[in-house]
Amino acid sequence: MKLVSNLRWFAAAVVAAACSVMVSAATWSTSAQYGSYTLGSYTIYNDVWGSGAGPQTLYIDTTSSSAPHFWAVSNQPSTSGVKSYPNASKTINQTITAISSLTGNFNVSGGTGSYDWAFDCWVPSEVMVWTKWAGSVGPWGSLYQSNVSIGGVTYNVYQPGGPWSFLRTSQTSSGSANLAAIFKWLVNGGHLSNGTIGQCQYGVEITSGNSTWTVNSCSVN
């Protein structure tokens, strides 16, 4: 009987420890529509901005200041239009020609339905870099040029009628984007002036789905 009792105690202790780890890994959360949390040089936003959006809760591992780790539990209806963009944002505040390098790194997982993982930067015009997507989603505007190689990655470029959008021809859940090279490609092509880079964000545009979308890590440096 004592052995059984000890085993039960040990099992309970293991479960309690596991639960403690799970809770402590997310030390801050919000269900507020525009809830945000400052983490080092980044601000993490819940950003539930679309029409007809459903509930969403943002969880943040507040120990991950150098490469934010956060996730959104979101339940969005199967209607058109982006409902939310939970993201990590960093202000760059340098002109395009002044930067020698600017790289966006990402590692993501999860998600069902219709969504796209993307960088969204303001230079000051909007420039998006899609890294992975699923379901009934697509960029604004129309195709401008296909199979453009920038910084070792091949993109299809969209613009007329919308922001400049660079969609990887080979989607990935983990990798990097040479943001400086993308901005300079636009400047050298006469598509942008040498503007000041404001915010660069990375996250997921959720159109529909009931799931958890996780940024295991991301950074812009």
Where in this protein do the model-derived segments appear?
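Bacterial N-terminal signal peptides
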Residues: 11-20
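Long, compositionally biased interface segments
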Residues: 173-221
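Beta-sandwich interaction modules
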Residues: 81-95, 165-193
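Bacterial N-terminal signal peptides that target proteins for export
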Residues: 2-11
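Short helix-loop boundary/capping segments
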Residues: 124-180
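N-terminal segment immediately downstream of the Sec signal-peptide cleavage site
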Residues: 26-73
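Sec/Tat signal peptide C-region and signal peptidase I cleavage site
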Residues: 21-25
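Extracellular-facing segments of soluble proteins and assemblies that are Gly/Ser/Thr-biased and enriched
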Residues: 76-145
